[in-house]
């Protein structure tokens, strides 16, 4: 597999064409962002940690029979992915009240939800990724009724697997963000990454083991992510 020209550069990743039109070469970068990119900081080693954590998680999801874009890890900072057209939705699942959900409804963080709640956010930095509902998704021609139901069902299925993974290493999966993409044949599969950048994780003492240590300036991101990776590697 040969790495070719740059296709896209995002906040935390660079995507390159390869000599296979259906495969992308992905490089994880060291940039940390918050507030939809308003705050940016280069943190040496972050890209390698996220790539390794994401690779381990996606390997486990693939082993469970889920359809994902992940092919294989190439190096500490690189992996191969199936090429997809990203659906402009952030699909968020919440198991515990925290973050923007707590603020929006005036609730205290830490309340365990009786049933997980799935939310959609429109991927548009200029609009600050607004919270939208099913009707908005259809109006914007992002997804059909059946696709919306698929996204919700698949997200709930992924939640069950992820909760098991994180529980095994002593962490609570508070909430997380997923992105999905369409293959050339139109089928929808899980894409992007699953890491402490996209998940809110708490340990048994309620300590944050995710990007909140950066967002809220309450800890060292590299130390936190390294601990998460070390715990995951013990479950191989």
UniProtKB/Swiss-Prot annotation:
Query: Per the record, a Pfam family?
Result: SAICAR_synt
Reactions accelerated catalytically: 5-amino-1-(5-phospho-D-ribosyl)imidazole-4-carboxylate + L-aspartate + ATP = (2S)-2-[5-amino-1-(5-phospho-beta-D-ribosyl)imidazole-4-carboxamido]succinate + ADP + phosphate + 2 H(+)
List the protein's name. Answer: Phosphoribosylaminoimidazole-succinocarboxamide synthase
The record's annotation in InterPro entries points to: SAICAR_synt/ADE2_N (IPR028923), SAICAR_synt_PurC (IPR033934), SAICAR_synth (IPR001636), SAICAR_synthetase (IPR050089), SAICAR_synthetase_CS (IPR018236)
The scientific name of the source species is Lactococcus lactis subsp. cremoris (strain SK11)
Q: Which gene encodes it?
A: purC
Pathway this chain belongs to: Purine metabolism; IMP biosynthesis via de novo pathway; 5-amino-1-(5-phospho-D-ribosyl)imidazole-4-carboxamide from 5-amino-1-(5-phospho-D-ribosyl)imidazole-4-carboxylate: step 1/2
Q: Which HAMAP family match?
A: SAICAR_synth
Q: Which NCBIfam families match?
A: purC (TIGR00081)
The answer on whether this UniProt entry bears the keyword Kinase reads no
Task: Name the UniProt key words of this record, in alphabetical order.
Answer: ATP-binding, Ligase, Nucleotide-binding, Purine biosynthesis
């Amino acid at each position: 597999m040969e790495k070719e020209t740059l296709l896209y550069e995002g906040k935390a990743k660079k995507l390159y064409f390869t000599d296979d039109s259906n495969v992308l070469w992905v490089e994880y970068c060291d940039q940390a962002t918050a507030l939809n990119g308003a705050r940016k900081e280069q943190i040496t080693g972050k890209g390698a940690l996220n790539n390794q954590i994401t690779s381990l998680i996606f390997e486990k999801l693939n082993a469970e029979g889920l359809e994902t874009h992940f092919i294989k890890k190439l190096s500490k900072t690189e992996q191969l992915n199936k090429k997809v057209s990203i659906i402009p939705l952030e699909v968020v699942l919440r198991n515990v009240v925290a973050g923007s959900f707590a603020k929006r409804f005036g609730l205290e963080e830490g309340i365990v939800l009786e049933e997980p709640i799935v939310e959609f956010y429109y991927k548009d930095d200029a609009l600050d990724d607004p919270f939208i509902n099913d009707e908005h998704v259809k109006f914007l021609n992002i997804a059909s009724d059946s696709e919306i139901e698929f996204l919700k069902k698949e997200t709930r299925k992924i939640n069950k697997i992820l909760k098991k993974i994180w529980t095994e290493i002593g962490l609570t999966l508070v909430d997380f963000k997923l992105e999905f993409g369409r293959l050339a044949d139109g089928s929808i599969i899980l894409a992007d990454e699953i890491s402490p950048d996209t998940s809110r994780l708490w340990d048994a003492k309620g300590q944050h083991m995710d990007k909140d240590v950066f967002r809220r300036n309450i800890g060292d991101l590299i130390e936190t992510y390294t601990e998460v990776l070390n715990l995951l590697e013990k479950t191989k």
